């Protein structure tokens, strides 16, 4: 998965509307001639870089003439003091973009960093770590991109990607078989079917329906192992529910194919990132004397 400016522009514009509103009532009054200044965005914490394109687009939206040099790429390691972006832009630009640009990098790097920890924990197994749909509504695409930068894979992007039969679908349909039969009669032939199973009996029923993916939902290790014996290679075996950094290793070592982890996106600690303006030009500062002279 890759991001491009066309995809991210609506997110950037909304963030700037939230941040600037009708105008910057602090920086706008302090800046004088508004000369070009230099600045750096750099890491104060350690982790995996993500969100640089959003920071870049944030700056260019406010100042189309800005010059930005990327010192690292999304998905690379960073540590304290590492410079991520070098920027040349009008002095007023930095007041307006600082919070948004930093927030994009901090939050997305937080997801990528946590994801990398999970991936490293189970790299001795064949399991594929994926995200879920849990997270901030409206930002799913960005969160899933950050997961990829951290080295994991994406689960479905939306309910239109596959047939995912969950507990409430089963209740409404009166059982797995009826749900699958109804959905097979209506869904595109290209769709895979995944069924969320809470018991071994549900696993067997789903297998009898010929579904392509079995999700072991909140099962303990013994249940997962028993479920894998039932599956026996006839479907992709996915474990999900309550997975954390303490439990993922024993789950992976059962031999499941996929572990979906809501924790990648629903509980994130951001990475500390900062912006530092360099060599402030005297003409950038509007003194009270200059203001009085300008206003008569």
Label every PLM stretch briefly.
Residues 218, 241, 263-264:
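Short secondary-structure boundary segments
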Residues 213-221:
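Extended hydrophobic secondary-structure segments
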Residues 1-209, 213, 225-230, 235-238, ...:
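Acidic/glycine-rich phosphate/pyrophosphate-binding loops and surrounding catalytic core
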Residues 263-295:
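Short, charged, intrinsically disordered terminal tails
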């Amino acid at each position: 998965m890759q991001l491009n400016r066309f995809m991210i522009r609506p997110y950037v514009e909304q963030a700037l509307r939230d941040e600037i509103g009708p105008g910057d009532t602090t920086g706008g009054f302090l800046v004088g001639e508004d000369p070009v200044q230099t600045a750096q965005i750099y890491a104060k914490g350690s982790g995996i870089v993500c969100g640089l394109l959003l920071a870049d687009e944030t700056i260019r939206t406010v100042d189309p003439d800005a010059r930005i040099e990327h010192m690292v790429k999304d998905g690379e390691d960073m540590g304290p003091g590492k410079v991520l972006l070098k920027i040349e832009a009008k002095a007023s630009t930095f007041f307006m973009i600082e919070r948004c640009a930093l927030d994009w990098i901090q939050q997305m790097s937080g997801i990528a960093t946590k994801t990398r920890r999970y991936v490293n924990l189970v790299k001795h197994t064949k399991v594929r770590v994926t995200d879920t749909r849990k997270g901030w509504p409206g930002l799913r695409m960005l969160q899933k991109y950050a997961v990829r930068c951290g080295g994991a894979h994406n689960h479905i992007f939306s309910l239109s990607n596959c047939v995912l039969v969950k507990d409430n679908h089963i209740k409404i349909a009166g059982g797995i078989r009826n749900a699958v039969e109804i959905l097979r009669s209506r869904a595109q032939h290209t769709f895979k079917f995944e069924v969320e199973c809470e018991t071994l009996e549900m696993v067997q029923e789903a297998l009898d329906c010929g579904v392509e993916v079995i999700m072991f939902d909140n099962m303990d290790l013994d249940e997962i192992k028993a479920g894998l014996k039932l599956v026996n290679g006839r479907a992709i075996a996915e474990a999900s529910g309550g997975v954390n950094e303490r439990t993922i290793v024993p789950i992976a070592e059962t031999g499941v194919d996929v572990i979906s982890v809501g924790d990648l996106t629903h509980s994130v600690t951001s990475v500390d990132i900062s912006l530092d303006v360099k060599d402030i030009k005297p003409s950038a500062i509007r003194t009270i004397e200059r203001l009085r002279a300008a206003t008569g």
